[in-house]
Amino acid sequence: MGNLSTPKSVQKLQTALHAKAKAEAGYRFYALYDKTSREDVLAHAYAQCRSNKGAPGVDGQEFADIEAYGVQRWLGELALALRQETYRPDPIRRVFIPKANGKLRPLGISTLRDRVCMTAAMLVLEPIFEADLPPEQYAYRPGRNAQQAVVDVEALLFSGHPEVVDADLADYFGSIPHAELLKSAARRIVDRRVLHLIKMWLECPVEETDDRGRKTRTTEARDNRRGIPQGSPISPLLANLYMRRFVLGWKMLGLERSLGTRIVTYADDLVILCRKGKAEEALHRLHEIMGKLKLTVNEEKTRICTVPSGEFDFLGYSVCCRRRKERRATANGVVKLHER
């Protein structure tokens, strides 16, 4: 979000929420909905969405349209809809983005109104759930990034974890079960109106346009009761919230100690670093736990790698570990770890 700074009033709110969550692990927040419609929160949410730019949703509305109408007027109407509980999200416009491997990745584009509302909710909820996320999770978190995740993977390889379960989850975002995700949210959030907002966003219809310009709408997320749309402002937070279940489950079962393992996750990218001779058992337990979470391990893409004889890719980095590494950018800008 560039140099966009958070207003002091919003910072104060976020600091108080985070401090309360950090101090009381069992505390459940009961009065949050009104905070999402606060003038300062909505204004900052709009500024964030504006700085991120992005294409219009199904209604075709662009930021220029809002500014011509009057931002304060537009935000005031959104705040009123939230307070009167008449707000309803629009369908999500689905587009397909080419991936490096030639396949297409679905991306959900919400309307600007919904993006601002989701961002406002994220501004309120993120400080609470951030207090609960374990250090093994690196994605979408303040002060953490992909390079830190790779650096820590490298450090673990050098500290006696030479076997790696390089895991791939089949359609993680599209597979997250709504009921279980909402249970994870309700562990901290009592405010039924906030939970209802999340539920509405999860169940949004999806609109696609074919090559002939014909539009079709589906309700697969609501019908299947699973999946969070990639591309929405609140999806990263929800994805982290559900992955937390796996990380905590692994620890609660004593697998970190008994198998000598360490986990590093970045969204749906996951590696389990193991003591020698423990990777096979770790892979078995991975399948077991993910099955209980109603997630699927992609067997074709999940493998065991032993360093220094092998290497694996993680977050656009090629990791190999025969000697100390140096980092350099390749021609396409992807940074890799190479042997010195």
Predicted regions and their residues:
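Non-catalytic, polymerase-adjacent accessory regions of viral genome-replication enzymes
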Residues: 1-72
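Short alpha-helical scaffolding segments that buttress acidic/His motifs in well-ordered protein cores
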Residues: 45-49, 120, 197-202
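Short beta-strand-to-loop capping motifs
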Residues: 67, 111, 272-276
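Conserved polymerase palm-domain catalytic core
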Residues: 74-77, 81-96, 100, 132-307, ...
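Glycine-rich active-site/cofactor-binding loop and its immediate structural neighborhood
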Residues: 96, 101-110, 118
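Duplex nucleic acid-engaging cores and interfaces of nucleic-acid transaction enzymes
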Residues: 112-122, 146, 150, 154
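Electropositive, glycine- and tryptophan-enriched low-complexity nucleic-acid-binding patches
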Residues: 119-137
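Active-site and adjacent loop segments of nucleotide-processing enzymes
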Residues: 317-340
